[in-house]
Amino acid sequence: MPELPEVETTRRGLAPLLEGRRVTGMTVRQARLRWPVPAGLPDAITGQTIRAVDRRAKYLLFRTPAGTLILHLGMSGSLRVIPGQQAGACAVPPGRHDHVDLRLADGSCLRYTDPRRFGSLHWCTGEPEAHWLLHRLGPEPFDTAFDGDRLHRLSRGRRTSVKAFIMDSGIVVGVGNIYASESLFRAGIHPGRPAGRVGLARYRRLAGAVREVLAEAIAAGGTTLRDFTASDGRPGYFAQTLNVYGRAGAPCPRCGRSIRQRRIAQRSTWYCPGCQR
């Protein structure tokens, strides 16, 4: 699943190609995604100019004067801009999993592809931050509202694992399975430790590790494991620097002990039994 760095990489690739462009039409070939594509979406967005391409958590926000298109890539979704197309339709024929085309006045086309169809498109005419998908989300990991003190305060009395705790989007957004494992390794915290038994100093270290890991992943263009490529088709390269994720049995880069794998909160988890306590 594309996580925050992958979605931010997509946003950065799309913004200069879409901002200031007028939408001339929308084709929906498959409306049955995680939630059905709103029947009125093509009419609502046609004629609108995309003012900004933003991100909130793992959602892309295409802001126009009339409303905001909120898009989630789901498990395997991707977006790419096909340049210089014929008027009225994308010149590149759609493939089996190309479900939505957004046509632009300069002849280009934004194409949404989703083999597993777990993504979604929504139209919001009010403040998108108040939309039911977004209004309960926690702070962004790079916001000043996110720090170790917040983690420590919200974790008191919680018996859930610290890994599940930092993956809770109500606590902080964008820390998915890959980056939770990597952040906990950097902070030296065992992923199965109860969240309420992690002290303030360690939470401050963990908050810093989360920011570092996510910033490095964004700079590397995300992590390509199976489905993800950036909007220009290039893979992400953060996978080349993973310390524990997906490395069961390999030596820890710090202490040399074998990386272990176990399921925590229904998710595969990797950690070093020597470095993480």
Curated annotation (Swiss-Prot):
A zinc finger (FPG-type) spans 243-277. Its EC number is 3.2.2.23, 4.2.99.18. It comes from the Bacteria. Binds 1 zinc ion per subunit. It catalyses: Hydrolysis of DNA containing ring-opened 7-methylguanine residues, releasing 2,6-diamino-4-hydroxy-5-(N-methyl)formamidopyrimidine; 2'-deoxyribonucleotide-(2'-deoxyribose 5'-phosphate)-2'-deoxyribonucleotide-DNA = a 3'-end 2'-deoxyribonucleotide-(2,3-dehydro-2,3-deoxyribose 5'-phosphate)-DNA + a 5'-end 5'-phospho-2'-deoxyribonucleoside-DNA + H(+). One of its GO terms (biological process) is base-excision repair. GO terms for molecular function: 8-oxo-7,8-dihydroguanine DNA N-glycosylase activity; class I DNA-(apurinic or apyrimidinic site) endonuclease activity; damaged DNA binding; zinc ion binding. The keyword Ribonucleoprotein does not apply. Belongs to the FPG family. This is Formamidopyrimidine-DNA glycosylase. It comes from Alkalilimnicola ehrlichii (strain ATCC BAA-1101 / DSM 17681 / MLHE-1). The lineage of its organism: Bacteria, Pseudomonadati, Pseudomonadota, Gammaproteobacteria, Chromatiales.
